[in-house]
Structures are given as structure tokens and as C-alpha cells.
Amino acid sequence: MRAVSFLLLLTPTAAMFEDQADNIDWHRQNLGRAAHALFHSENTQRLAIIATESSVLAALDLRSGSVSWRQVLPVGESVTSLQTNGKVLLSLSTTPAGAFVRLWSMRGAMLWDALLPPSAGAKEMLPPDALFAGPGVVVSWGDSVTAFDYNVGDVAWRWLASGEEVQMRRLLLVGEAEEQQLQAFGVLSSGKLLRATLSPKDGSLVTSKALGSHSASDFLPRSQMVVTLDQASVAWLKGTALLQHKVGSDVIATTQLETLLPSLGGLGAAQLLPLTLPGMLALAVPAHGDAPAATVLLSVTGGGVVVADTLQGEVQLAHALSREGKATLARIDGGTELRVMAFEPDGKASAWSEAESLPYSAAEHGALAAAWLNSYARKDGSLGHRLLLSSQDDALQLMQAAKDGGHVAWVREEGLSSVQGSVTLVPLPSLVTDADAEGPPAFAFALPGVLQGLQRRWSEATAITATDEPAPRYADAYGTRQVLLLHGGAKVFGLHTSSGELLWAHWVAPLRHGAPSPEVKEVVRMEGHKVWAIVQDEAQLRILCLDAHNGQLVSESASTGELLHVSKLRLDDGASGLLLFDASLSVSLHPDTPAMRQAVHARLDSFFFYLLFKAEAAPSLRGYSLRLAADAGKHFELAPRWALALPSDVELSSTDFPATAMVGSPVRVLGDRSVMHKYVNRNLLALGLATPQNSSDEAYVQVMLVDTVSGVVVHSARHAGCSAPLTLALAEHWLVYHYWCGNQFQYQMTATELYANNTLLDDPISLLVGGPLDYTDRANMFDAFSPAAAQPHVASQTYAFGTGVAAMAATLTAGGLTPKAVILATTAGQLVTMSKNLLDTRRPLVHPSKMSQQQKEEGLVPYAPTLGGINPLTVLTHRHTIARPAHVFTAPTTLESTSLVVGIGLDLFLTRTAPAREFDRLNDDFNHVALVGAVAFLTVATLASNWYTKRRDLVAAWK
């Protein structure tokens, strides 16, 4: 038995060295826009615990802004509340399936969770409420109040409201410690307020009473119920009336806002702010007509409602509660000034403090969206204030207020959690030596630059780069140092591809003050290091020219319309332009110059476009061409050519082959020296249709290859009994797609290869030596209208695969000569590289020992019905995980062997991969010293032997 155990331990294990990880890659954790936040201090640890709109729960180190821990909740789950008692963290979240109650340790470990089902027959469910009560956690939701055991999460008791329909809203714990009672407030369908008094020990009903007499339209109040810190009042809004219940009485007082605030407009859209203050409420009134927005503080301590203060303009309020029970209210005016109001335990409020400056820039981040206050005691006994700010661009930053201007502790660009569209890469500037403009350059002049370059290369090859040292801001010889351009929302980001460092971020402000944030639709590279950012701002279409190296705005233009599609044009002189289509199918040029119009007119018969309409009631794929406009006020217009109707009850997905990707060879050389001509059609669009997994209709997956110029369906495959999710990857002449097969309860991958029906006996040697074809030359372009274009030879093969795939892409290299690999982003958050040889449609059905010599020379792999497990050495992300992966992009470097891989989801990940090893570059651990020493030794030995030979011949001649 011991021998068997010993032999089992001798099985080979795949691994990598620790110094190999994070050497050529980086991982950026994102959280999303902050929705809730609280602060926690324990010993020397200072944390900000936040919940985001992206269903993420995380703790940030207040010193650096780094993520201490993070929990990614399921998609579609909305966190509605965060609470802590100093020892544990309580989170409440809602989904269509119910409300989740979770208890976490302050280090991010989930202690227990529970699911509360929705009320039967309820059309709309309001957010739950919870509090810590003795040895348990009490939660009110729907028509019930449930208590959970603090230690294990078991249900201790549950109280259900009887009678008419009710929605429980708030919980209060009133009374002394030994005689505490639980009061649960809800709204009945008749519009009355239900107050149920329960025992926190067993949930027994003490009293229950319906208060007030209001219309049934108040059954679901638009305003949340707000409880004052002293728990003396419960308030909510009904229309323009403020309803206030005095705890301990049966009275509901009504105050009309028009009478209380006659000078303000927009009272019908006013909202109570969720601030817990002693004897005070905060009311946010939006701008209306000429009346500006205002925030009103209402005092409710004297039995009535009195306006304590009216704050005009853009004001953000935040509150904090000290351990001694003192409340602090912070007021942020315009994002640049901070004033503080302190409350005594008896509820007495002080005046606003002297203004302190905040270094907030609205030009870089937009308006403030939310603020959270963290007050702390300074060494001199005074109070200091930190502010956690969430802005319009989703950025999260910690600021320290001070009279001398304050400072920004850190900034997290959380807009990177919602990156949209494709990525754009722009090389960094090269290091150059300014030469004398007069006279030809000389070697003596270039020698210092050459020596500096050699010294820099030597230091990069031998030195170990410090982790806190920024990556160089200049290009390298391998093309791995570039600017990675991403866009999300109204912001464009420039990241360093070597380190993930944020080089710059450009916020696009709305044209109209107070308008919704614009949306960056596309980023298109121009000539040089300039890029166009196409932005949709309400009914305006804006085109921004940005410097990709620093994010500076070079120029901006605007036009009317809603963007539908944009295409890049390249003129004969090397300049670039844009063709823009709006929702009315109108065509515009940028820049609209005579040279641009003349260039488009000269190639008018070669412009073809396709548009995929997914959001319409009847989805369709339509093809268009460009023609001269009949309207004298326009130059060009779209002409419909073909249309393909699509079903409306399926999930649509599509992908194409990048127009700039290189194809190394137009043929595939077989083992018998014959060739198969690749069907290289850059007009192909891979269109996938898949029924949802929970659909009651007949399940199927259908994949079509459509020529977007002629509208011909070149290939179509239908898989019955299969369903979504469907993921596609299209390369030069092959397609790979991944889907779920419900009949066999497994994931499957299908590979399809297309070859032209060509019988010419081309010489393989001449085809390979001739190099890659220039497909931008019209002589080498694909003719979509030829008879052979619609009749390729198709070979397909399907394999079983052991995991779900969220996205995939094929590697791209500088010349397209390197064997391809498929990059898979698994649903578990890993990036996996898979050789295309494993997905070859011509894998022979023989044992490896019986393969012919020709099959071995061709590099074929014996057939197997499954692709097997994932080799750990093929996992590019190694110890990292990409939360919710959505896209995979690849890009070439100047090295033919190497391709850049970018994984995008909630997180960002970038690495380099070499499918055929780095055959054109020395390894990083190459012994450069030994090489230089060997060359120097051989040089000295050669000179010495030459001298010795001449000396010997001279001595021999004298004899």
C-alpha cells in the first residue's frame, strides 16, 4: 500500500516558477460605481467598505486605495444596504428570485447567507430593511419580518402580516435594554401605515395598528422612509406632502411642501435623503424652470416642521456617527468647499464651520454623484474629515479637506469596469536624438546616442525592475510598449500595456449643464499618434481629436444626429477620414473637405456596409452601398442592397475578421506537398443564433457565414438540442464556436474550415517564398460576386469541452506566419490558450503510433472526441481571475512570434503569448554576460593568433 501511495506521488505536475508570474502581464481589479459605503477601523487597519452598482462588495485600504478583499456577487443582484456592528458586516441585496441576507467577517469571509422569497402575488418589491437585535439579525421584507441566528444564520422566528396586502418598510428597536421591543412599519394596500410591535426574542405580536387614512395610491410611496437618529420620527413623502409619524403615538402629521417652501419649484419630484440625523431631515429639490436645485434641512424636534437651512445650487450632504453617538453633517458646495455641522447627543446642532477647500476637479470627473464622510480625531484633539467621493464619471477618490487646499489621497478610475467596444493600440514615442539640420549626419555625432542605447538595453536586460518604478514612457524594439485606449461611458482611458499604469483619462463633459452624461461610441486611430473619439451627446454627435500619448484635446467638431455606424477611410496620400451613418441612414464625412469628397467619389462603387439591427421587434441584417445623394444639400447616401430577416426569440451574436490582420499564406501545404487554397474572404460575418437556456421553444444553435457585400449565406450549420451561451471566433479561413449541448449535458466546440474550390497545381515552394499577399491591393481583393465566392469547400468537426467560455479570439501576429492559437476566456475568469492544431478539422482517426509520415509532417494531432482538460501551463492568467469576462482582444507586436492578449470584463488583464515559442527573441534569463565574454575572448584570441602567425612566419623567413 505504501508503494502504491509513493508511485501516485510520482505523477508529473505542470507548474511555473514564481518569478515567471506577473513578468509580462498585469491585472487590474475594478469594482464599479459606488452605491453604498461605510468605514471600519481595527487596530492600524483603516478600511472603506463599499457596495457598487455592479454587484460587488469590497474593502479598500484608506491609505492607498488598494483592494484588501473583494466579493463579486451574481449578475443582476442589487445591493440595497450595508450595516455593521463593528464586528461583522451585514449586506442586503435583491434579485428577481428574492432578497439575500448575508453576514460577512470584516476580512471578507462570508459567514452565512439566507434567501427570502418574494411575497406571493406582489408586482413590485421594495428594498428590505434590517437591524442587529440581541443575538440575531432581523430583516423586514414584503409581508414578513424574519429573525436569523447571529452565529449560523438559521431562522429563529418569522412573523407574517395577515389581512390585506402590505409592504414592510422600516424596523426600529425601541425601549430599554431589557424591555426592548421591535417596531415594524409597513404600508397597507389601502394606503394606511401599519405599525406592528413584536418581541425581538420570539417574534410574538404585541400590538398591531393601522394608522392614518390616505389614498391607496400611497401603497408604494416613491420616497423611502427615513428615521431620525433619536428614533423619534419616521417620515416619508406622498406627492408634495411630508408625512411624519411620532414614534410612541398614533399621530401622523401632514405638512404641505408648497406651504413650507413657497419659493422653490419642482416639489413634486423632491426626495428625502437617507441621512440619519438627530431631529432633522434632509430634502433634495431638483431644479425646475428658473428655480435652481436646492437642499433643504428640516427640523422636526419641536413637534412641527421648521426649515433649518436652505442650500442653493449643487450640494452634496454626507453624515458620520462617532462612537460616542455624536453625529456630524458635511456639506460639499460645488465639489470644492467643505463645511461641517456638529450635533450634540441631545440633538442640538452647531453652526456651519468655516469652509475648507477640496481639490476636486469637475472638469476631469464631472459632477459629484455621492459622498461619504469619515471623521477622525487629530493629535491636537480637533476633528479631521476625510471624504470618499463618487463622481459622474464613476471615479472613486479619497480626499482630505484642509484650509490650505487639502489633497487627494488616491483616485480609482472605476469607469474601467464598464469598458465598451473594441480596444485601440497606439505605439509610444521612440527615443530619438536631435540631429543637426545642416549638413549630413556623421557617425561621431550618433556615437553618444548609440552608446546610450546600448547602455539602456544592457540595464533593461540585466537589472531587476523595481515594482514601484513606473514603466518607461517610450517604445521598445519589440512593440510591447504601447498605449492601450479604452472607453466606457463618457470617458476615454490611456493605459500602459507593459504595466497597466493609467497614463491619462479624458472626461467628455455634456454640452448642456445638468444634462445626462454623453457616451463614447467609438475610438478610431488616425495617422500618427492622434485618435478620434466619436461621442453621442443627446441629439448631438461630437467628434473629438485626442493625442493618444497624453490625452490632450486637439480639436472638436459637432453635428446633429444619432450615430448608427462609423467606418474609417484611408486616402491615397496616407490621410484618414470617417464615414458616419446616423439613425436616419444619412451619410456624413469627417473631415468634410473637397479632397475627402473627391476621394470617396472616386471609389464610390467599392463601398459596402452592413448593419445588424438587434434591438428591433423584427431583427435583421441589412447590406448597403454608397451612392450620390438625390438631395442637393447632401453629398452621399446609403442604398439598400439586401436584407436577411432574423428570428426575434433568439440570442444574436456576431464577429468578423479584422481588416488589418495579416494572412501569412493563401494556401495550406499538406503532408504530400499538395496545397489547399484558403477561402480568405474579409467580407465574411459570422452570425450566431441561439435559443436561451430556459426557453420553452425547441432548442437549437445556428451559425451562418454571410458575405456582407453580396448578402449570400456562404455556410450555415444548425445544431439541434443546443442552446446559448454561444461564443464565436473568426480567423482568416476558419471559424470556431462554443455552445451548450443540452442533449448531451456538455459544452461543445465546433471548428469549421473553408477552402476555395481551386484545382490549380501551384508550386508550394513559390507560394511560400513569395511571402504574404497584400490584400489591400485590388488585384488580390476577394471578388464577392464571382460564382466561386459562394461555393467554398467546408470541413467541420465538433469536440466536447469541459468548461464554459464567455469570449474567445484568435491570435494576431505582425506577418500572420506564426501558427494560430485560440484564446478562451472561461466563465471561471481564466484566459486559456489553445493551439489551433487541437481544433483542426482534419485530425486523423488513428492511433498516434499508426500515423503516416505525411500526417506527422503536416503536424496533425490524432482525433479524440474531447479536447481534454485544461493544462495549467496554458492558463495565461495563472493566479489571477478576471471577474465576469466579456471580451478578448488580440493585437500583433513587432515580433512575429508574439501577440498581445487583452481580457476585458469587470477586471482588465493584459499579457503576451507566443503560440510557437519566441523563436525571434532571446529569453529574459539569457546570459548576456557570458555571450559578451565569449565574443570578447574570441576577438582577443583571433587577434593574438593572427599576430602569432605573422611573427612565426617572419622568424621562419629570416632563418
Annotate each PLM feature.
Residues 31-40, 75-86, 118-133, 163-176, ...:
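Repeated scaffold domains used in trafficking and secretory/extracellular systems
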Residues 45-51, 87-94, 135-141, 146, ...:
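Short beta-strand elements that form the blades of beta-propeller/WD-repeat-like
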Residues 19-40, 45, 62, 399, ...:
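C-terminal scaffolding/assembly regions of large eukaryotic complex subunits
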Residues 62-64, 105-107, 150-152, 199-202, ...:
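Short loop/turn segments that connect beta-strands within beta-propeller blades
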Residues 22-29, 66-72, 110-118, 154-160, ...:
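A short beta-strand motif characteristic of beta-propeller blades
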